């Protein structure tokens, strides 16, 4: 999703692969997969970012990056 990252491609790909394997293991349809991933994002923000304002900023940045990645995937 990100065009620039401080993480190596191998790290991102390994984590992404683990997430995909887990969703496939549970035979999660698209709507359930999105719901679970959305809940995971919420949990990550709530448990790791104390400021509600900063959570909102990060959520907006994530949403924008997601929309941009969908545009470039066409």
Curated annotation (Swiss-Prot):
InterPro entries: UPF0352 (IPR009857), YejL_sf (IPR023202)
Protein species of origin: Glaesserella parasuis serovar 5 (strain SH0165)
Cited Gene3D superfamilies: YejL-like
Taxonomic lineage of the native organism: Bacteria, Pseudomonadati, Pseudomonadota, Gammaproteobacteria, Pasteurellales
NCBIfam families: PRK13689.1
Family (UniProt): Belongs to the UPF0352 family.
Protein name: UPF0352 protein HAPS_0210
A family per Pfam: DUF1414
């Amino acid at each position: 999703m990100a065009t620039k990252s401080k993480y190596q491609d191998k790290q991102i790909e390994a984590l992404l692969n683990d997430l995909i394997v887990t969703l496939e293991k549970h035979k999660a349809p698209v709507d359930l997969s999105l719901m679970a991933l959305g809940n995971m994002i919420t949990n990550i923000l709530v448990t790791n970012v104390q400021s509600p304002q900063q959570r909102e900023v990060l959520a907006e940045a994530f949403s924008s990056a997601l929309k941009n990645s969908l545009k470039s995937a066409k």
